[in-house]
Amino acid sequence: MKMADRSGKIIPGQVYIEVEYDYEYEAKDRKIVIKQGERYILVKKTNDDWWQVKPDENSKAFYVPAQYVKEVTRKALMPPVKQVAGLPNNSTKIMQSLHLQRSTENVNKLPELSSFGKPSSSVQGTGLIRDANQNFGPSYNQGQTVNLSLDLTHNNGKFNNDSHSPKVSSQNRTRSFGHFPGPEFLDVEKTSFSQEQSCDSAGEGSERIHQDSESGDELSSSSTEQIRATTPPNQGRPDSPVYANLQELKISQSALPPLPGSPAIQINGEWETHKDSSGRCYYYNRGTQERTWKPPRWTRDASISKGDFQNPGDQELLSSEENYYSTSYSQSDSQCGSPPRGWSEELDERGHTLYTSDYTNEKWLKHVDDQGRQYYYSADGSRSEWELPKYNASSQQQREIIKSRSLDRRLQEPIVLTKWRHSTIVLDTNDKESPTASKPCFPENESSPSSPKHQDTASSPKDQEKYGLLNVTKIAENGKKVRKNWLSSWAVLQGSSLLFTKTQGSSTSWFGSNQSKPEFTVDLKGATIEMASKDKSSKKNVFELKTRQGTELLIQSDNDTVINDWFKVLSSTINNQAVETDEGIEEEIPDSPGIEKHDKEKEQKDPKKLRSFKVSSIDSSEQKKTKKNLKKFLTRRPTLQAVREKGYIKDQVFGSNLANLCQRENGTVPKFVKLCIEHVEEHGLDIDGIYRVSGNLAVIQKLRFAVNHDEKLDLNDSKWEDIHVITGALKMFFRELPEPLFTFNHFNDFVNAIKQEPRQRVAAVKDLIRQLPKPNQDTMQILFRHLRRVIENGEKNRMTYQSIAIVFGPTLLKPEKETGNIAVHTVYQNQIVELILLELSSIFGR
């Protein structure tokens, strides 16, 4: 069956693979065919050889060879195009007004900024801040405010700084500052994570504004204004410095952060935190390859106090084109670190931010486009929006939602929030938090995160069902028993997953802290939980958690209340989770493509260990009945000898006594030995290093398995095409004989014979061979004649008498008990085999 269409719909948030080479094989119930260029959804990387994929969400998964495919970039549904009202398609001039307000209270404190960003000592203005729409505006002090208008000319999306540089009018300058002696020019430029556009046609270095004089982080995120002082055309450097009403803003030359060259310090979704050579932190997006000095806004818990805004009407807005370029941070309050009202926020298994509606259970994912703008798309890929949908809920629904989230507010200890700047905020859970729905969102570095006003309004941690400190140990993993090792771990219950980290550290959850990656995760779907018996642990307050993957945990706490709460919450979570069928379990993993590419027959596999699901407890009466039936079965079970006598069990070929094997096959030479010798003489006499080169042990074991189970063996099959596999199996047959071809009781006699004079050696060895059992004599004769033919083709295969003797000496001749004379015995073993090969006609006749 053909698997995928090249033009299939790309589902957002999925990981896809692309086929690089054609491949086909026979599965258990169908024929798998993949073609070059086809794409599939990656379900699981099972091992290094095979990956599990499926054509679409509703199809059955199957396996493809990992070497034949490649993983492609994760696709996401592109955001809808936002048209700006009145924006012409052709090149026209669009005037913008950036309204900068200042307070007259500090008119005598404004600093003078030269064109090189060095402060003078004249006057000082109020600092710029951002409102909820990420627009620049001044801090709000009571007093008279004056608008300073900057006219910007836009041409084909680029700012022209020749003839249309934004000018500060003399009238406005005189009214605002009173003593500015000449025209000033300010260029406002857009920057993004991935590129910086130059506004200076004269080639002067760009200089960025710093928002925080203490942190020194640049405004390098998307939709950020970059303000620079330039000289108008045909004029020299201005006689007087350029002034603007900006407070505590730094202008410095800076480049993009370097590419990461070391592992990430911290990972949050697709964003990684790194340090450069000077120890300064910067941020890198794995998906979009964006780099920035400033923490991404959508990942931070930015909060403000009540006093930051006295009047919402004082917020200054950018013009329509300004909003067009800065849509990524001007849409919803969910970008401030807390989800919008009516939505709950969590991370999915791939680290994406997932929003679930509290009213409709609809799921939406957040993504960032190539320009750094945030948008949202539904989990099924049918819709994409710049903002999350808004629902009008009744007061009763809101009360139920608030009640369901009340678990997080019962914490007795203070909550510690970790900021991106690694400073902390301690919240007292007994304090009443004022509503924050109407509060605008600010960058974190607008005010010190450790200031007292943040303690009242900082957002609470991400919604979680339960978390706390527990003692935990594994007693089984993947169905195998492991040694108990009790550890104190910080446990976090997230949906159907129970996560464990080392310690609480500086966060109430494993998100946002330095230990953001959990030590291990437990899937609660299909799990069982019960109080542990005394034979499992001597500790008190211990319960046992078993997963359907075969992992067994013991969880303990000295506090009775804590352990009872955890037991109730986990029991409730397990009961509410539906057990999903794993299609990958039912699908049999095929053999390695490089070895058995054309295999048309499936090898007989060992029975799989089926996963048991504990659906309901068994009554004690049923348990007694089961034990009784098992006892009856064991007592009536026939012995192994009786089964062999009836012919139900047959001895295997490998490891069987040579005489018994020949008797069972009604001959004096094993059929497998004849089969291997005939195949080698037909196909392998001219192979370089025949018998000296080892074959693939895994394939040799498969051949051994086929021989032992009386399967129809065809050595011409493509899966046995490697001649060294055949020779390796033949050597293994003689090596695994219970008694070697030269029997134990004659070993010392053969050693004494080889020590005699050269003329007497041949006769002594010949007499000893005649004393061996008939199957040993005949098998030895056919084997040595075959090895002699191999040596006769030595010009092609480069095998000599000595090299063959080294290979077969220890295999055919060995003492019953190894002693300290192993090296001496090896010399004699090789000499005996070499003598028989040289004197073959004298010993066995022609």
UniProtKB/Swiss-Prot annotation:
Q: Where is the composition biased (Polar residues)?
A: 152-175, 191-200, 224-234, 445-461
Matching Pfam families, A to Z?
Answer: PH, RhoGAP, SH3-WW_linker, SH3_1, WW
Instruction: Indicate the segments forming the SH3 domain, all copies.
Output: 12-74
Q: Name one GO cellular component term.
A: glutamatergic synapse
Q: Which SMART domains match?
A: PH, RhoGAP, SH3, WW
Repeat as UniProt keyword? yes
For the site labelled Arginine finger, the residues are 692
**Which Gene Ontology MF annotations are present?**
GTPase activator activity
Q: Where is the PH domain?
A: 463-575
What are the WW domain coordinates in residue numbering? Answer: 265-298, 358-391
For this protein, the record's PROSITE patterns field holds: PH_DOMAIN, RHOGAP, SH3, WW_DOMAIN_2
Q: Which residues carry this modification: Phosphotyrosine?
A: 243
| Record's keyword terms, sorted | GTPase activation, Phosphoprotein, Repeat, SH3 domain
A single Gene Ontology biological process assigned to it is: actin filament organization
Q: Where in this protein does the record say Phosphoserine is found?
A: 165, 176, 201, 213, 215, 240, 592
Query: Where do Basic and acidic residues bias regions lie?
Result: 594-609
Top-level division of the source organism's lineage: Eukaryota
| InterPro entries for this protein | ARHGAP12_SH3 (IPR035491), PH-like_dom_sf (IPR011993), PH_domain (IPR001849), Rho-GAP (IPR050729), Rho_GTPase_activation_prot (IPR008936), RhoGAP_dom (IPR000198), SH3-like_dom_sf (IPR036028), SH3_domain (IPR001452)
Sequence segments annotated as region (Disordered): 152-241, 293-316, 428-466, 580-629
Q: What does the record give as the function of this protein?
A: GTPase activator for the Rho-type GTPases by converting them to an inactive GDP-bound state.
Q: What is the name of this protein?
A: Rho GTPase-activating protein 12
Q: Which gene encodes it?
A: ARHGAP12
